[in-house]
Amino acid sequence: MPITPTKYAITTRQSANWSDAKRRVFALYRRWLRSTPEMQSMYSLPLPISVIRTRIRQEFERNRFVNKLPVVDVLLTKGHADYQETMNFWRQTTHMMSYFNEESFRGAKRLPSSFIDGFLQGRN
């Protein structure tokens, strides 16, 4: 299946009011959630779909209390850009796994916290 770069592109625009911004945020959120199974198979993520959806929700909840309309518009533009990059397979699996620190396949502690810990582990 060939990838069309403009398939997921959306024209940047400003929200007219808060109800318009809310509608656009919910539409973007639904797009992310609906594409979760496809993301899991494209990137061969070793995580269940429920964990991926929970992480998407956490990203949206992080910006829940933004109270300036221009800031919401910028966040929407960034969200659409991230969605396009993700669905066009312009990221690597490591980029996707960086969103899941606790489930990361690299491990939580890549480097020892002190010299003696590294020495005892045989890393130095």
UniProtKB/Swiss-Prot annotation:
Topology of this chain in the membrane: Peripheral membrane protein
TM helices/strands, residue ranges: none
UniProt keyword annotation of Membrane present: yes
Record localization: Mitochondrion inner membrane
Listed InterPro entries: Complex1_LYR_NDUFA6_LYRM6 (IPR045299), NADH_Ub_cplx-1_asu_su-6 (IPR016488)
Protein's UniProt keywords contain Nucleus: no
Any one of the GO CC terms: respiratory chain complex I
UniProt keyword terms in alphabetical order: Electron transport, Membrane, Mitochondrion, Mitochondrion inner membrane, Respiratory chain, Transport
Subunit structure: Complex I is composed of about 40 different subunits. Belongs to the peripheral arm of the complex, most likely the globular part.
Family according to the record: Belongs to the complex I LYR family.
Biological role stated in the UniProt entry: Accessory subunit of the mitochondrial membrane respiratory chain NADH dehydrogenase (Complex I), that is believed to be not involved in catalysis. Complex I functions in the transfer of electrons from NADH to the respiratory chain. The immediate electron acceptor for the enzyme is believed to be ubiquinone. The precise function of this subunit is unknown but believed to be important.
Protein name: NADH-ubiquinone oxidoreductase 14.8 kDa subunit
Organism encoding this protein: Neurospora crassa (strain ATCC 24698 / 74-OR23-1A / CBS 708.71 / DSM 1257 / FGSC 987)
